[in-house]
Amino acid sequence: MRDVNLAKYQFDYDLTWAGLFVSPDGRVLGRYGGRDAESADGKVSLKGLRYAMEAARKANRERPPPKAAPERRTVADYPGLKRLGPTACVHCHQVHELQRDALQARGEWGLDKLWVYPPPENVGLTLEVDRGNVVARVAPKSAAEKAGLRQGDVIRTIGGEPVASFADAQYALHRHESNEPLAAVWLRDGKEMAGKLELADGWRKSDISWRWSLRQLEPSPWVHGDDLTSQEKKALGLGEKRLALRQGNFVTPPARQAGIRQNDIIIGVDGRELEMTGRQFPVYVKLNYKVGDKVTYNLLRDGKRVDVELTLAGRP
């Protein structure tokens, strides 16, 4: 990503794979890819890719050429690049990290900036995988239902952005950073229809625990490991959804100094009985605590409850 023009090639940089359809004159005609917290590939298929490519080919014939060359912006514009070294490979997820670093340095960053590329489910839309702009389901009482969308509708645009895939829908939602109503246009039985998506506070939020770019966000919980199985939880009297993270072989210095040991089972924080996975737990800490905060990890050790106080130190 070192020399990629970020002003032109905009996509979700946390993805394992992303595709953009670009015309010879430089127009981005569409995007393909996207994922959710459940699966890295549940939102994509070869049929869906072909469907999006056909839409891009049609757009190439119909859309006017660009009036001017897009601005050029690369990771070299972010001061944080210096810490990676002049020859280091810049991975996709590091673009998000560099952008975050720049905003933090200017005092313009807040937790609300974490919610990038919200999935269409956030506005009540589930799209077909093989036909990425066809509505498979509309959630009851959602923004999509209130706007008038129904199963089988074919979405043309969201916020003025053409939609032919899950990634297109995410991009359109990503560009809309406010709670103001968002325009949508769709086809029903060949007839064009339009409506407004009325967005509630926090509409961008979703499970972002899969995002690699969050790993460097502080504070670190300083614990890591694997989830207990359902059978192991049941044997300990824990519910199936209860947090039960077994501390791994390597115990970080902050955790070790606090008294946490290998195979300790983290089941809560500050007395809260959390229902989440071990992958979601670090994000919970990052969203609810700051560097320097003292937390009490609620543990099970050899079947007995143990409370350990740990200071969420910053990285060296």
Kindly give the residue locations of the regions a language model identified:
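A short, hydrophobic beta-strand/beta-hairpin element that forms part of a small beta-sheet core
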Residues: T16-R35
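Sequence context surrounding c-type heme c attachment/ligation sites in exported
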Residues: R35-G124, V129
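PDZ/PDZ-like peptide-tail recognition elements
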Residues: V90-R137, K196-L245, D307-P316
